[in-house]
């Protein structure tokens, strides 16, 4: 079963994080939405965060993980928000289990195929893992020349956890991701079509545009590498 952090009470909202992320990436926004009467479930995908590792890793399998989680929690229908990899998983859930999803929000991803583009990050995390640093400061100093963007470094550092030996280790399943990078970018099937009410949000530089199921567009400034916004219409 997927690890989760549940915040608030009310109508369920399930949030699926992006590649190399975890549910906690959305904790700040989950608290705000919980204040509006939502029960926000921050899920860690398999091979990420505190969830289990498995060589089985596909959007079909990850979408079934979401349904299995909802069944275990006694949740029949839910709103679903997915970012990046989580956005593809969310789309697959809406395709295959339309009766379970009330509303769908997809952030910064389409259903098309993407070429592998995380090689540099995965290699850096692998090298960092081998260093067995004892402090996050050491780990950040190691990453700084490779990734000068502070937001990206902080995002990657969230992958670290302290072992029983007192050193920092990468939580995600690096060996799998490095062996099969193509699985992340795989296209979703074109059928069945999604008929769930949906909002698709795309990023353009430091702004993003929102495209909903009626074709309306909107923009919000100030969005960087890590998702940093709270104007998604969830209520």
Predicted regions located by residue number:
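Alpha/beta-hydrolase fold catalytic core
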Residues: 1-14, 35-38, 75-76, 182, ...
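Flexible "cap/lid" loop of the alpha/beta hydrolase fold
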Residues: 91-96, 102-134
């Amino acid at each position: 079963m997927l690890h989760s952090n549940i915040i608030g009470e009310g109508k369920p909202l399930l949030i699926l994080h992006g590649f190399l992320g975890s549910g906690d990436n959305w904790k700040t926004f989950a608290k705000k939405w919980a204040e509006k009467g939502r029960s926000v479930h921050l899920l860690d995908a398999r091979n990420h965060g505190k969830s289990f590792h498995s060589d089985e890793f596909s959007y079909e399998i990850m979408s079934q993980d979401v349904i299995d989680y909802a069944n275990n929690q006694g949740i029949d229908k839910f709103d679903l928000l997915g970012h990046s990899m989580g956005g593809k998983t969310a789309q697959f859930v809406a395709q295959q289990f339309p009766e379970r999803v009330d509303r769908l929000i997809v952030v910064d991803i389409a259903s098309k195929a993407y070429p592998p583009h995380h090689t540099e990050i995965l290699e850096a995390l692998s090298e960092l893992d081998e260093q067995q640093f004892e402090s996050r400061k050491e780990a950040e100093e190691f990453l700084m020349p490779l990734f000068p963007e502070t937001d990206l470094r902080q995002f990657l550092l969230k992958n670290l956890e302290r072992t029983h030996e007192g050193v920092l280790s990468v939580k995600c399943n690096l060996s799998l991701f490095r062996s099969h990078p193509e699985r992340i970018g795989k296209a979703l099937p074109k059928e069945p079509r999604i008929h769930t009410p949906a909002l698709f949000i795309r990023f353009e530089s430091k702004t993003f545009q929102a495209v909903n199921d009626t074709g309306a567009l909107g923009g919000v400034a100030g969005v960087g590498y890590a998702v940093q916004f709270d104007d998604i219409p969830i209520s």
